[in-house]
Amino acid sequence: MARRPLLGRSHALDGLRGLALVWVVTYHFTSSRGPFPGGWVGLDVFFVLSGFLITAMLLDELRTHGRLSLPMFYARRACRLLPALLVMLAVWTVLLLAFSDSTWFAATPGGDGSGDPVDISAALGQVGITLAYGANWVYALGSGDAPLAHLWSLAVEEQFYVVWPLIVLLLIKLPAARRVWPVLALAAVSATLPFVYYDGGLGTDRIYFGTDTRAVGMLLGAVAALTWHRRRSTGRPSWRPTARAWVGFTLIVVFLLAVGNGPVKSLIGPAVVALAAMQVVPYLVDRPSSRLARGLDGRVLVWLGQRSYAVYLWHYLLATWLNPLPSLVSIPVGVAASLALAWASWRWIESPALRYSRRFRPMPPAAVMPQTARPRAIAAAA
């Protein structure tokens, strides 16, 4: 008989995503000179969340249906990611063509304020690269234009989404107790590569933006999911989960407040923050009544977490466009506009697309029908 899925809705994970979004948006609007010099840690939290959720959902599909449908998985990912991205890129392209000579398309948020107009052909080429989810390699090679620079992280995640289900199909051929070890080995390689590249003379851009060096976050998220799923399936207790979660969260905050732009950010930052976040994420799922989970389960953070994708898509463009204005104007206007656009995107673009994506879910056996709404809810935020 098919078994019920293990992954249900977690408002605390939404809240963690919302908190990570606050860190990233603040970092971009204040050019790392604001209250969160290490706001880049929010991206590493995103990566761990993505690795955990995608892996847990794939394992749940296998547990519930006895198989994985790759076409349906890719269709669901397309429904989740493409509509909002296409709208944002369309709006940006129209504005770019309409105001191509305007200094409002300055180089970077918080840059030197020179206001050099963006090269139209290069910018339009970047749209194509973004749609192909290869933007991170443009920046890794040091040839990207700034207005869409933030989309490099989406490229890394999408490359992971393409490859990871294929790896999961191989992993499930192993005994459950052994599945985690190949993934840990891959994560160790990804965490080591920055030092190899740095010693070899490669620049920090290649290290920071490369898929091979940034996969560590999603791989450690996958490790957390594999461990969590096996533990929940067997009923085995976790070792000191509360202590590990608080140590992990504290370490993330230390990096957030103390580690700005520099070699640490590229060399050890992603791996250390990912190691810390992988202690937090499964704990929030297991202990929704814990102090840490309740602290993240606030209405504002959950709202932000559920709409984080659209906020992330729009905020950097607004930070770029508003850069010439005084920060007392650009920051509140940019943040407010980002939230308004995210609200509209969630209501009229993302929510309809998510409803449409349900047709790409395998029909569950009758024995598990009452539980199917729960994993769908959490999947919507992944």
What are these regions (language model features)?
Residues 23, 54-56, 90-93, 160-174, ...:
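Membrane-interfacial alpha-helical segments at the cytosolic side of multi-pass membrane proteins
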Residues 16-28, 49-50, 88, 178-198, ...:
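Small-polar-interrupted transmembrane alpha-helices in polytopic inner-membrane proteins
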